[in-house]
From Swiss-Prot:
GO BP annotations listed: mitochondrial respirasome assembly
Record-annotated membrane-spanning stretches: 32-48, 68-85
Gene from which this protein is expressed: rcf1
Gene3D superfamilies assigned to the protein according to its UniProt record, in alphabetical order: 6.10.140.1320
Physiological role: Cytochrome c oxidase subunit which plays a role in assembly of respiratory supercomplexes.
PANTHER family per record: HIG1 DOMAIN FAMILY MEMBER 1A, HYPOXIA-INDUCBILE GENE 1 HIG1 -RELATED
Protein name stated in the entry: Respiratory supercomplex factor 1, mitochondrial
Membrane topology: Multi-pass membrane protein
Coiled coil spans: 88-108
Cell compartment(s), UniProt: Mitochondrion membrane
Domain of life: Eukaryota
InterPro entries according to UniProt: Hypoxia_induced_domain, RCF1
Any one cellular-component term (Gene Ontology): mitochondrial membrane
Family, similarity comment: Belongs to the RCF1 family.
Length: 180
């Protein structure tokens, strides 16, 4: 179903599965201005808070303006980075989709192998069971086909005794007379 990954993904070590920390570091290296803008915003808020506690309203207003500028810088960095790294992100999405397809195909193949193994085990069990049943039927047929002379004589005496309603003594006497 899924084709092998294109060669552009194979040679590039950047396109590998990554942990959360690796992803954070990669994003930090790709767009260093965004964390810088966030840090500037936090610093401006911290300075505004200290100015407010000290009662310096001029410095506080100046820091609030600096916070607005830092937030604007962060937004510009986000938009510019998004435009700059658009193709790379699209390639990364394609790669992640290909990796997901490969994983799902591997899971499906493993599931099919497991089903085949179970099917083979089931067939083997059925064959063994059928062979045992056939052997038992064959043994029963052999036992039924070849009655021994004693069994035949005893059977005929019993059948004759049942038909004539003879007593036990008469049946024994008849059996003794046949054996002589």
């Amino acid at each position: 179903m899924s084709d092998p990954l294109p060669s552009s993904f194979e040679d590039n070590p950047q396109f590998e599965e990554e942990t959360g920390l690796q992803k954070f570091r990669r994003r930090l290296k790709e767009e260093p201005l965004i964390p810088l803008g966030c840090a500037a915003t936090c610093y401006a808020l911290y300075r505004a808070y200290r100015s407010m506690k000290a009662g310096d309203s001029v410095e506080m207003n100046r820091m609030f303006r600096a916070r607005i500028y830092a937030q604007a810088f962060t937004l510009v960095a986000v938009v510019a980075g998004g435009m700059y790294f658009k193709t790379e992100r699209q390639q990364r999405r394609e790669f992640e989709k290909a990796v997901e397809e490969r994983k799902s195909q591997e899971k499906r193949d493993a599931w099919l192998r497991e089903l085949e193994i179970r099917d083979q085990e089931d067939r083997g069990w059925r064959e063994r069971h059928a062979a045992m049943e056939a052997a038992a039927n064959e043994a029963a047929k052999k036992a039924a086909v070849k009655p021994t002379a004693e069994q035949d004589a005893a059977r005929s005496v019993i059948e004759a005794a049942d038909q004539k309603s003879l007593g036990v003594l008469d049946a024994v006497m008849e059996l003794m007379s046949r054996q002589k």
